[in-house]
A protein has these predicted regions:
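Positively charged, low-complexity/disordered segments
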Residues: 241-243
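Phosphodiester-processing cores and adjacent nucleic acid-binding clamps
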Residues: 1-239
């Protein structure tokens, strides 16, 4: 692996340590954040509830300007948009979009949320809005597969959306721990974080044990129908990054 990205949820606390550790190992560090996007204004404390209180969006700094803008975006989330999570809105993304590459994110992304509800046209409209903000070639539809049926449904619709809109695809893994054998310790840490017990049925969990750093061979096995998406991911992570 010659490149790696950090995209913690809503924060950038770890980027400096990550950057230094990656450079020390000869790895190209991609600095990013998986931000929370409010469904309306970041100042609105009423819009949306539950899973619609915010959507996920992955942002990657392409260069030094992008890194500076990413810090602005994350700071705005805390100082102006905090409501359960540090949220930003489309106005913030428009103001600080330069030098940033965006990915549609996981099942909690706006595009994927609509697709899971059968609202294809709304999903496509959301994707086109993000492309308009970040520019053609700077917004990607993100394929993921952790053995979850909903992801396979979303992936098929993203392939269709790619054909209809020309928005390029990438294929990623939603990494929350390093190795496959770290799944159980990670589950325990989730319980500690959320004040739950392992036996609680309704607690937050990452099903299937697939949220680790996968090899190129494992990713190719998951996405034989989307080799171009895998190639785009490789190209994405060999692009210039902040120094």
């Amino acid at each position: 692996m010659d490149s790696a990205a950090i995209t913690d949820h809503g924060v950038m606390y770890g980027v400096i340590d990550f950057y230094r550790a990656a450079r020390a190992e000869g790895i190209n560090p991609i600095l990013g954040c998986e931000v929370y996007v409010a469904p309306g204004s970041r100042f609105d404390r009423e819009a949306g509830s539950g899973e619609d209180r915010y959507y996920h969006l992955v942002l990657l700094a392409e260069n030094n300007q992008g890194y500076a803008n990413l810090m602005k975006i994350v700071s705005k989330g805390f100082t102006e948009g905090f409501y359960y999570k540090p949220r930003v809105d489309l106005a913030v993304l428009k103001e600080y979009h330069e030098g940033i590459i965006a990915l549609s994110a996981c099942l909690a992304g706006e595009v994927a949320r609509y697709l899971q509800r059968g609202m294809y046209e709304d999903a496509k409209a959301a994707a086109l809005r993000y492309q308009d903000i970040f520019g053609k070639g700077n917004f990607f539809l993100e394929l993921q597969d952790h053995g979850i049926p909903a992801q396979r449904l979303v992936n098929q619709e993203l392939l269709r959306m790619h054909e209809e809109t020309g928005i390029d695809l990438v294929a990623t893994n939603d990494v929350h721990y390093t190795r496959a054998e770290d799944a159980d310790p990670h589950d325990i840490l989730l319980c500690l974080q959320t004040n739950k017990k392992l036996a609680d049925e309704d607690r937050m969990r990452y099903e299937g044990g697939q949220y680790y750093v996968k090899s190129p061979e494992e990713m190719a096995e998951l996405f034989p129908y989307a080799l171009e998406a895998l190639e785009n991911t490789c190209l994405l992570y060999t692009s210039p990054s902040p120094r």
